[in-house]
Amino acid sequence: MSSWDVSMSNHAGLVFNPIRTVSDNAKPSPSPKPIIKLSVGDPTLDKNLLTSAAQIKKLKEAIDSQECNGYFPTVGSPEAREAVATWWRNSFVHKEELKSTIVKDNVVLCSGGSHGILMAITAICDAGDYALVPQPGFPHYETVCKAYGIGMHFYNCRPENDWEADLDEIRRLKDDKTKLLIVTNPSNPCGSNFSRKHVEDIVRLAEELRLPLFSDEIYAGMVFKGKDPNATFTSVADFETTVPRVILGGTAKNLVVPGWRLGWLLYVDPHGNGPSFLEGLKRVGMLVCGPCTVVQAALGEALLNTPQEHLDQIVAKIEESAMYLYNHIGECIGLAPTMPRGAMYLMSRIDLEKYRDIKTDVEFFEKLLEEENVQVLPGTIFHAPGFTRLTTTRPVEVYREAVERIKAFCQRHAAV
């Protein structure tokens, strides 16, 4: 009898998620100290940030109703899609003449933000095409592109300019095979929030280059105001332009339910220049047949009836932790943080010359975990060698302990 030939597909072999691989497979530290995870952007740790009671109540009612146990349309239920359109229109589109462009029929639900990224990229890009991708950037863009044979032109976001995108570099990188421009605002991993002018400059550049725009706005509204009381989030939906735009949003971050796996893609194209983009979203969504139905049933309550004070409190807690970390991590030898302005992350430069036996950001990550049981992420994962990323969602007391451990670690490895 011949042996079985059961081998992994070439496609599966191309799939690699660096954040999950590093965080899920890190070797246990021999340190007796309890682990401090500052690696994965999960806002539910410690129950420091809580889902609203009304949201939980609505989910329970949906389960008990026996009305949500069957199939919904693959694009999502009409009620959930209407809730997304209404919330986005009322929250992030300030020009009255543009509000009519945000409609239910242009919303496609997805099973979380990562699924939305896959849908948006593969809806318009074939193998051999290219996407313009930010660096530092969320690694899942690269995960999807590599899995589907899509090339990437990486453009820089500059730390010296509050992590703004290098627009001249985007212009130079664009070629005949480029099909899509990807932007992230507020940014994972940078913790940045673009000014309205910079968002408009990106939109105008996409217009000039005739490139559809995929805007990852999963952290919409999560902006810090302590240093700038006038700081605000600007969506690419809030501009009159001929650019077809697909905007990613979801419940994972500001509504504190990443495990519910519910996001959305909002197509904005009042001039009708990219209708096949929307059709592509609908088709690739059929591969999963839509997100969880009971969660869809709770979406309207979550978006439209969660008290603004609850959402503001979530952002305020994240900002408090972010600013504590920013104000104290620089006390550690070799670390120079950049100012966090939104999302739930802080990036710090690592001056490797300050250490006698740490040569890369990956070594910094590995040794810090081994010796102090503090888990951060190396900047290399985000195409930012020489940096480290720390999450900012945990209580301040956690960061007090983390800073003390990191400080001791850096002192121990400091060059003489």
UniProtKB/Swiss-Prot annotation:
Swiss-Prot/TrEMBL cofactor(s): pyridoxal 5'-phosphate
Subcellular location: Cytoplasm; Mitochondrion
Domain of life: Eukaryota
CDD domains: AAT_like (cd00609)
Reaction it catalyzes: L-tyrosine + 2-oxoglutarate = 3-(4-hydroxyphenyl)pyruvate + L-glutamate
GO biological process: biosynthetic process; L-phenylalanine catabolic process; tyrosine catabolic process
Keyword field: Aminotransferase, Cytoplasm, Mitochondrion, Phenylalanine catabolism, Pyridoxal phosphate, Transferase, Tyrosine catabolism
Similarity field: Belongs to the class-I pyridoxal-phosphate-dependent aminotransferase family.
Subunit structure: Homodimer.
UniProt name for this protein: Tyrosine aminotransferase
UniProt lineage: Eukaryota, Discoba, Euglenozoa, Kinetoplastea, Metakinetoplastina
